[in-house]
Design a protein with these regions (language model features):
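Sec-dependent signal peptide recognition
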Residues: 2-8
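Hydrophobic h-region of N-terminal signal peptides that target proteins for export
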Residues: 9-18
Length: 225
């Protein structure tokens, strides 16, 4: 009996001792990375692990060593717009990111006017939404909408996933961000990725704690509109 317990404990220890590579939600299948740039890709692995990344656009391999807390980061060079590509990341166990596009990436942040999706809010429709949904898919646009999440401290990751523009996904994408991305794609003829981080009436959540405290006691002037 003791031998069985020891074997089970050893197996559990072996599984927990090896921390697999983990990536933030942003680095996933279908993502868009900035073209003609040096982009930073990061994640976690077992402390001291050798992490390698191979970029599909030039088959160049980048290598680094995970820090004592498991964090690692690599700076990867990207060429002109194109795709789809694969990115392979390994510490002995490989992760493959598929359907990666290189193009223009923009952060679209704000309050309710940026958050409002193509389908609109309750009793607040968006003009032209029906046409936008019907035309969805004609433009090479992908969106990552950051999920709402509260925290008292800065976070290393967020909820969300990349979606390609289609009749099924466009209704839930920020209307302002989507129209901007479509115009950008039609002008530049390259893939466009938008990262939507918007939350109506929640401006304070986008400020660092120390900076936010400076505005807590400020009041609006006597006359405003």
């Amino acid at each position: 009996m003791k031998r069985i317990v020891c074997i089970i404990c050893a197996a559990v220890f072996a599984l927990t001792a090896r921390a697999e590579i983990r990536l933030p939600a942003f680095f996933a299948d279908g993502m868009v990375l900035q073209q003609q740039a040096t982009v930073r890709i990061w994640g976690t692995a077992a402390a001291g692990a050798k992490v390698t990344l191979t970029a599909g656009w030039d088959n160049r391999t980048y290598t680094c060593k995970a820090a004592s807390n498991g964090s690692w980061a690599l700076k990867v060079k990207t060429p002109a717009a194109g795709g789809p590509y694969e990115i392979r990341i390994s510490d002995g166990e490989e992760i493959v990111l598929r359907d990666v596009q290189l193009g223009e990436v923009w952060i679209c942040s704000g309050q309710s006017n940026m958050e409002m999706p193509v389908k609109g809010f309750l009793s607040q429709p968006v003009e032209g939404a029906f046409e936008m949904i019907l035309d969805a898919g004609k433009d090479n646009v992908r969106a990552f909408t950051v999920a709402r999440r509260l925290s008292d401290t800065p976070q290393a990751d967020c909820g969300g996933k990349w979606v390609a523009a289609s009749a099924g996904t466009v209704p839930d994408i920020s209307s302002v961000a989507y129209l901007f991305a479509c115009r950008l794609h039609r002008t530049l003829k390259v893939p466009v990725g938008i990262v939507v981080a918007a939350w109506g009436g929640f401006w304070g959540g986008f400020l660092p704690g120390k900076l936010r405290k400076r505005f807590q006691k400020r009041s609006a002037p006597g006359y405003w509109r």
